[in-house]
Structures are given as structure tokens and as C-alpha cells.
Amino acid sequence: MTVWMLVNIAQHPGEEVVATADKAEMQVAERDGRDSESDNAEADDTSAGTSDDAAADERAREPAELPEGKVDTTELPPGGPYTEAGEETYYEVGSTGAEAGSGDEIVVRYVVEVEHGVDTSNYGGDDAFAAMIDATLADPRGWTNDPRFRFEHVSGDDNPTLKIRLTSVGTTRKMCGADIGMETSCRTRITGEDTVVVNESRWVRGAAPFEGDLGRYRQYLINHEVGHALGFSEHVPCPADGDLAPIMMQQTLSLNNAELRSFDPSEVYPDNPDTCRSNPWPYPRPAVQ
């Protein structure tokens, strides 16, 4: 038999070799398959881990979900401290010399003052208050876009025609009244001099309709009250829902006609739901000069 097998192999050598090679290849393939499955499982685990980590990182970057409070436009927004009561006397601040506008009809010579007892250090100091007045009145979106008006920052002994005063809450109420029970500023002649009274609480805290943008609110406050001094005595309602609010609208209190009417039915506001967008400028889109 041994002789026959050797003869058979000698006569047909390829069959046994091929069979042996095929068997070896199958064993290698099975082993590689198991290894490949194992590698894929590890890859899947790694991929899942990376995806989970990324999702966790994404969640970590999201703000916490907190209940939203109702905005009460009649209240001061949260913010820094302000002065409840000052001394009802004033000192001059800022540098004179700022000027802007043509003044074809009206030249306003203004002085900037702060009430004794008001601490301006929390918002840049006395000069920062005066600089904001100067910059706002000189802005091309402001009143000087109309050639009828001109502003000049002068000293208190240089015959000013308008005093712009940063005033404590208590003094503001005496100067402006407190009939509607909300913090406001005003233009008044109660002292015999034309005066814009800037309520410090509003300068510090702003107003809810401006959604925390203190700079834009301060610009609005200046332009609105100076507008009264220029002769724009009447307030102006929101002309259409979604429009920019007129500068002479009482944006400190609300941007909605019906809500403003509810505060004072004798005012000009119609009883409609039109709500404007906050706007600090008389001419928000000035013509290119």
C-alpha cells in the first residue's frame, strides 16, 4: 500500500498539494475573519466612545435651561448701584469746545453738570458722562442731521441756553414729578432755566425695551430729552408694527402703543397692538453728505 500511495503521489502530485494548500488557506481565512471581526468590534467601540464624548462635550457647552421671568417694563432692570438722594446742587463736568451742526434756526449752547452726592465712578466718572453727551449730540444720526440745529458745549459762565444734569432719583422726582410711578427723565423749566434732567437710575440701569443695551439707551435718553428742548414737545406713537420707534416715543416705558396708552390715557398713543423696535436716533438712516 505504501508503494501504491507513493506511486499515486508521483503520478498525481498537484491534487494533494492543492488540497493541502486550500485547507491551509481556509484556516488562515477563518483566523483572519475572527481577527477582523474583533478589530471591527474594537473600532465600533472606539467610534461609539468618540460620538458619546462629542455629545457630552456639546451638552456641556449648552447653557443651563432656566425658567424665563416676565419682563416688567415699569421696573428698573437689574444692574449697578445708583444714588437715591443727592444734595440738589451741581458742579460742571467735561471739556468745553465740542460743536456740531449748521444752526440755521436754533443754536443750543449747553453745559454738562452732575449733582453733588452722585457717584459716577462706577460708570467711567464725570468726564465719561460729559463725553457721551458730546458724542451723541454730534452724531450724524442725531438732531444735527437737520440743518436747523447746532450744538455747542460751553462753560457755565458762557451764557448756556441749556443745562444737562445727571441727577439722583430723589431730585429727579422733585424736578420731573412722579405721577406715573416709574423712573423717568425729563426736560423742565421748573428752576427758570431750560434743563434736561437725566435720572441716574436710568443712566445706570437702562430700560427693558432696550434689552440690556445700555449704550443705545443712553443715546436715546439724551436725544429724546434734548428733542423736547428743541421744541418737540409732543410724544409720538409707533407708526406701524415692526417699525423703528420715533425718537419722541416714550421708549423708556414701552414700545407698544396700547401699553403706553394704559399708563396715561391722555397721551397721544392709540389703543392698538402696534409695537415698534427700539431706536435711539432722530434720523437713524441719514442721507449721505
Labelled PLM ranges:
Residues 1-140:
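N-terminal low-structure segments adjacent to metalloprotease catalytic domains
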Residues 107-109, 161-163, 195, 244-245:
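A residue-level signal for beta-strand positions that form part of recognition/binding surfaces
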Residues 122-130, 211-215, 219, 241:
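Solvent-exposed, acidic/flexible segments
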Residues 131, 135-216:
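Metzincin-family zinc-dependent endopeptidase catalytic domain
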Residues 135-144, 229, 233, 251-254:
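Structured segments of extracytoplasmic/periplasmic soluble domains
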Residues 1-39, 44, 49, 192, ...:
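Metalloprotease/metallohydrolase-associated module, dominated by Zn2+-dependent proteases
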Residues 116-119, 169-173, 202-205, 227-228, ...:
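Solvent-exposed loop/turn segments at secondary-structure junctions
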Residues 215-234:
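Active-site recognition of the HExxH zinc-binding catalytic motif
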